[in-house]
Amino acid sequence: MNIASPQWRGKGADLGVLLTNLGTPTAPTPRAVRHFLREFLSDPRVVELPRWVWLPVLHGIVLRLRPRYAARAYARIWGEEGSPLLTHSEHQAARLTERLAGDGVKVVLGMRYGQPSIRSALEALRAAGVGRLLVLPLFPQYSAVTTASVFDAVARTLGSWRRLPEVRMPMGYHDDPGYITAVTHAIRMAFEAHGVPDRLLFSFHGLPRDAVERGDPYGDQCQATARLVADSMGLQPDRWQVAFQSRVGPWAWLAPYTLETLTAWARAGVRSVQVVCPGFAADCLETLEEIDIRDREAFLAAGGEDFQYIPALNDSPQHIEILWQLVARHGRGWLDAAPGSPGEPGVYGLGQGDQQDHEQDHEAER
């Protein structure tokens, strides 16, 4: 076959967007949770211990004890449509598809762990004949545990392909002006609905301190996100704080811890708090069960009177707008025309090699 023939080249002109998040069990049962945790906790990006040390602990202790407890937690937040994380993620993909209608972009969802998998999502894009791939991890703050692990999974799948697409993958958007604006909007709406609280807590998923000491920028990016949002709202330093949740194991993690912060505030006389979790692109076990149920109960039991959880951005119009902007920016040069009007401010931005221009634009917006 002539390699210049259309049959050999394939389509190769359309853009495929892979939306990806952490993942979820298929059911709130010990068996399903065990299967999910086995895949999740076997990732060397997640637990950076020597395999000969960690795997016996994982299979001999963790997978024997934790699934039953975790399944009960999942059952508390499981919806009629299934896992909240999967439901919100599917809605995000559907809304983004609608937002990009007519631009020759195919959006698929693939979870890092569980189903639908990154592999199945990439195979769907290959079957559709896309020649350009934009991987969009829904982790605003970069960490090797999350974003880099997505890169690993994509690379493993593509490693078995003979014909590779062009690939781009942003490494986060923790200080993206649109993201900061959307988080700020969500907080303002909560303040209008429930009143201005005594304290606002920015709660991010925790990370072992050892990972930060090895160079992971996650902690600094969490602080930067919270500071940008607080500054945009004009909050005084004594009215807000950053804390880290979901700590497990005996190791030191990024501090202060969310639960300890909330209970200490209540005991010190803080009566009302609102908690926002900007690192979670969709509500999930860590926000709905850990924060909105268990941490709420702990705060009230310690003497607090009013606790409000501010939902994740989920598939809100503001969030879909962020995702659209990210696709337009990182797909620059791939699309015949970026979504929206050609001269629309903020649509054209970061393509490969345009990081400096983006940073200058961001400084100007500040």
Regions found by a protein language model. Name each.
Residues 1-366:
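Active-site-proximal alpha-helix that buttresses catalytic centers in soluble enzyme cores
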